[in-house]
């Protein structure tokens, strides 16, 4: 059992090393959000094409960092442990900035 967990952790670490910059930003945004994050808000913040957004979502979903939320147009951390691990790895000042950016983008997108 202990060896299995080590192997799983090593594999997970290798996966995270290959994560694209957009994938990292997306997983950070979803983990920083205090509520399920809408697709439109994520795309606005990432400033990427529809195609790149789709590819980035596929990447983070496949790595079990993010999953669809209760509404099919929202996204949340894959599970509580994943969300906690990502959000605690973010500098507190950056976390505050990300949350402010999310709030501002949500207002602009849905005006």
What are these regions (language model features)?
Residues 1-111:
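Short secondary-structure boundary elements
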């Amino acid at each position: 059992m202990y060896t299995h967990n080590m192997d799983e952790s090593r594999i997970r670490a290798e996966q995270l090393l290959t994560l694209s910059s957009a994938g990292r930003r997306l997983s950070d945004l979803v983990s920083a959000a205090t509520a399920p994050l809408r697709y439109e808000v994520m795309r606005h913040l990432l400033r990427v094409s529809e195609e790149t957004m789709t590819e980035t979502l596929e990447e983070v979903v496949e790595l079990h960092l993010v999953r669809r939320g209760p509404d099919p147009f929202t996204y949340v951390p894959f599970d509580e442990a994943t969300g906690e691990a990502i959000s605690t790895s973010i500098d507190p000042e950056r976390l505050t900035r990300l949350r402010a950016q999310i709030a501002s983008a949500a207002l602009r997108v849905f005006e």
